């Protein structure tokens, strides 16, 4: 066990968890980024609720939200780190894992500050429905991100995180990767958004996305995809300005993404002049596997509450928001 406050030791152990040959594209990095983003993206500026404090996904009210489907894998991958460093809160661990993954996968260094505490019950868990719905367009994106205090430039910068990972039809309802190398942070998302011919496609679950089928692809190759919210970045004039800039200038994108993601990680956090968090209970809550699953990233037991077996018999898992 490390000494309390030894975040470098925690970082090293997070990096040791990144390589996962049997999971997705061989890396837990993208799901760590999504876990960090979803843990903070519930913030509401007007009511000052939600945000990265609390680790509310330990409770069914937040962890069982369809928008967070699949994130139990990220939480489970990080359990060995928590067991080795029990002094770190889940809220700090999940956000730190996101910024560590971004840098380890070739992205920019994101400023991260500790001090978050974990909720001791679910009384302060934010309501569901605050995360973006990827089936929507520009107006929806602005409604969600303006609520958190972001502007158009920051919205587009954060969307560049789609250069990592892929969608799963049993989680978000969409299917496929955005880019050819989904475990390497780059500005490729913006380049492909602008240059490829994206065609609408309706998936078996009735949800529509956009795909590019490479005429030179080999049999079995998975087509790249874009979400309706991604296409909105290209078609909305104000968003498009930043898409063009980031496609042309990787360094600018990295700089803006790092600043926007650091801001995201601080949503709902208030600090004093010494950077100590002053709006938390300073009590560390215990681990609760929510939805009610094991600590292993193998999925729920058959019929487990919060899992997908029942939904699958009724036409598939409920569509989650991204």
Curated annotation (Swiss-Prot):
Heme b binds at residue 162. Disulfide bonds: none annotated. The keyword Iron applies. The keyword tRNA-binding does not apply. GO terms for biological process: cellular response to oxidative stress; hydrogen peroxide catabolic process; response to reactive oxygen species. It holds the Pfam family peroxidase. The active site is at 38 (proton acceptor), 178 (tryptophan radical intermediate). Residues 288-322 are annotated as: Disordered. Binds 1 heme b (iron(II)-protoporphyrin IX) group per subunit. It comes from Aspergillus fumigatus (strain ATCC MYA-4609 / CBS 101355 / FGSC A1100 / Af293) (Neosartorya fumigata). InterPro entries: Ccp1-like, Haem_peroxidase, Haem_peroxidase_sf, Peroxidase_I, Peroxidases_AS, Peroxidases_heam-ligand_BS. Keywords: Heme, Iron, Metal-binding, Oxidoreductase, Peroxidase. Destroys radicals which are normally produced within the cells and which are toxic to biological systems. Its EC number is 1.11.1.-. The record marks 34 as: Transition state stabilizer. GO terms for molecular function: heme binding; metal ion binding; peroxidase activity. This is Putative heme-binding peroxidase. Its cofactor is heme b. Belongs to the peroxidase family. Cytochrome c peroxidase subfamily.
């Amino acid at each position: 066990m490390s000494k309390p406050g030894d975040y470098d030791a925690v970082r090293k152990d997070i990096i040791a968890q990144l390589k996962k040959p049997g999971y997705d594209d061989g890396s837990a990095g993208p799901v760590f980024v999504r876990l960090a983003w979803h843990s903070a993206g519930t913030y509401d500026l007007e009511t000052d609720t939600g945000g990265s404090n609390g680790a509310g996904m330990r409770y069914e009210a937040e962890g069982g939200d369809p928008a967070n489907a699949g994130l139990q894998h990220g939480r489970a991958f990080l359990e060995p780190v928590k067991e080795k460093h029990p002094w770190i809160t889940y809220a700090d661990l999940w956000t730190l894992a996101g910024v560590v993954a971004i840098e380890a996968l070739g992205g920019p260094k994101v400023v991260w500050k500790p001090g978050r505490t974990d909720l001791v019950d679910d009384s302060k868990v934010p309501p569901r429905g605050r995360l973006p719905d990827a089936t929507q367009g520009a107006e929806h994106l602005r409604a969600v991100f303006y609520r958190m205090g972001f502007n158009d430039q920051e919205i587009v910068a954060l969307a560049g995180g789609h250069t990592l990972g892929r969608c799963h039809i049993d989680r978000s309802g969409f299917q496929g990767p955005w880019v050819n190398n989904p475990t390497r942070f780059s500005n490729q998302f913006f380049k492909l958004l602008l240059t490829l011919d994206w065609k609408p496609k309706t998936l078996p679950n009735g949800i529509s996305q956009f795909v590019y089928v490479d005429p030179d692809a080999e049999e079995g190759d998975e087509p790249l995809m874009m979400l309706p919210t991604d296409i909105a970045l290209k078609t909305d004039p104000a968003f498009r300005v930043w898409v063009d800039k980031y496609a042309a200038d990787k360094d600018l994108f990295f700089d803006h993404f790092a600043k926007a993601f650091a801001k995201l990680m601080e949503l709902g956090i208030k600090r004093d002049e010494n950077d100590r968090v002053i709006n938390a209970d300073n009590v560390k809550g215990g681990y609760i596997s929510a939805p009610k699953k094991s600590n292993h990233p193998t999925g729920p037991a058959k019929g487990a509450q919060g899992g997908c077996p029942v939904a699958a018999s009724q036409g598939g898992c409920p569509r989650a928001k991204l």
